[in-house]
Amino acid sequence: MFTNNFSQKQILGVSKDASESEIRKAYRQLTKQWHPDKNPGNEEAQEKFIEINKAHEVLSDPEQRKIYDAYGEEGLNGQPGGPGGGPGEGFPGGGFGFDPFGDIFDNIFGGRRRQNAVRRGPSMEQIVQIHLSSFYTGGSFTLEIPVKRTCSVCSGQGFNPKYSADKAIESCPVCGGSGFRVIEHMIAPGFRQQMRMPCNACNGNGRTIKHKCPRCKGERVAEVVESFDIKVPAGAPEGYRIGFRGKADEIPGMEAGDIIVILEAAGGDYGWTRKDNDLYRKETISVREALLGNWKRKIQKLDGSFMEVKRSAGEVVHPGETERVKNQGMPIYNLHKGKTTSAHGSAYIEWEVKFPKKLKGKFLKDLNNLFEKYDNEFDEL
């Protein structure tokens, strides 16, 4: 094919800085000149026509042209110097998909693969909800995460170990081992376009696994469950991230990415909720306690211990009043130093007063008389 010897712009006969209109004009002229209907039986003309269409497709597409201008033909093919890996490297399914058994083929058939730098696979984020009390006290727990690892049955080869490699792997029945398929479609009356595309049956490899591994089904990796020790420092903020380098899914031909565990609070414990380093809760008291005072109350903290709040006689609590108790909030974790400090945030208690639904009888009468008797004093409060 001409692509091996000429650049896309040389094929169309345009300059390096050709505009879109110049490219379209050259394309129209060349397709008329090299159209197979005008050159019956001329294989060179047919190949030239295919190359002209391919060159036009690249140069008329902004993204492909950007890659071509930056990296040339090798960039389009994903070879060294381009933005992607070559055929059979990366993720399965696309033009830049990884070759799930490329090294097997090379070992069998003597191929020499390009020595690209190993790319990293994607990282995995795992959100885990823990009790607020665990953020307060700190601690550790074991987390089980399903991950993909090199298949233990076929040792990552992809084929059934009962068979030898040369018997387990065959030429692709769809593309005949070429790794490509020629797709033809009509672009205008009397004009047909042929596109040479990587075969989707073998992902452009030209070979397929005939006898696949019963465990991984030819994927070379299989799912297993691994245990990870999660350590939570006291006072760790919500959204605290714990990383495990190179422990994400193993992908053939790539370096495994990271597992990132993100900690979130499952909900309030002992009635507490959190905002940064401070804790919040609501407490209900009676009308008598609100008006007369002279009481003590123990409130359970997130570590199971208790703190005491109290009111002296005659100290009134208003509905909705919020009380701040210093140094009773969350332990303060220093993200920069990566350790828990001795300082604590504050605890905030919002007081709710429980009023009776209705007053009646002697109680209503006596209370009314009391207010009338001390009406002036209430006005002065």
UniProtKB/Swiss-Prot annotation:
One GO CC term, this protein: cytoplasm
Molecular function in Gene Ontology: Hsp70 protein binding; protein-folding chaperone binding; unfolded protein binding; zinc ion binding
Repeat positions for CXXCXGXG motif: 151-158, 172-179, 199-206, 213-220
Gly residues composition-biased segments: 78-93
Any single biological process term in GO: protein transport
Chain location of the short sequence motif Prevents secretion from ER per the record: 378-381
Record-given protein name: DnaJ-related protein spj1
Compartments it resides in: Endoplasmic reticulum
Source organism of the structure: Schizosaccharomyces pombe (strain 972 / ATCC 24843)
Keyword Iron: no
One Pfam short name: DnaJ
Entry keyword annotation includes ATP-binding: no
Keywords from the UniProt entry: Chaperone, Endoplasmic reticulum, Metal-binding, Protein transport, Repeat, Transport, Zinc, Zinc-finger
Region (Disordered): 72-93
Predominant location category: endoplasmic reticulum
Zinc finger intervals, CR-type: 138-225
Domain (J) ranges: 5-74
